[in-house]
Amino acid sequence: MSLRLASILALSLAALGLPAQQAIAQSPSVAGTWVNDHASVLVIQSVGADGSVTGTYANNAPGYKCAGVAFPLVGWMDGTRISYTVRWKNASVDCNSITSWTGYFNDGRLGVQWVVTFDEYGAPTIRTGSDSYTRR
């Protein structure tokens, strides 16, 4: 459902005195597997009616010590906007980092900016960057 159509529907429901929250929260169909230029794999398993996002992420960037391991992600969607976070730690491995991505879907692509926090040489470090994903 387009954002314009969702907005019109929400206003129509409001005029009738009906709840419009679900109509406003509609997001494009993004569930599935997405891959970026570093072959990292984002799997969006579900987008709830409230906009909550669940899935997994496997970072395959060169030199990453936890490459290929899928970690859970949590996040939110609102229309075409998305934000999600991965804590790179599970029962088997601790990569000592957290990454958050924020961006939007446009023309079948997902463009995001990311921020990662980790310790480098014993000092807290923050790095930023951007990625573009296509559906696999």
Outline where the language-model segments fall:
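Bacterial N-terminal signal peptides
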Residues: 8-17
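Sec/Tat signal peptide C-region and signal peptidase I cleavage site
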Residues: 18-25
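Central antiparallel beta-sheet cores of small beta-barrel/beta-sandwich binding domains
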Residues: 26-101, 105-106, 114, 121-136
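Bacterial N-terminal signal peptides that target proteins for export
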Residues: 1-8
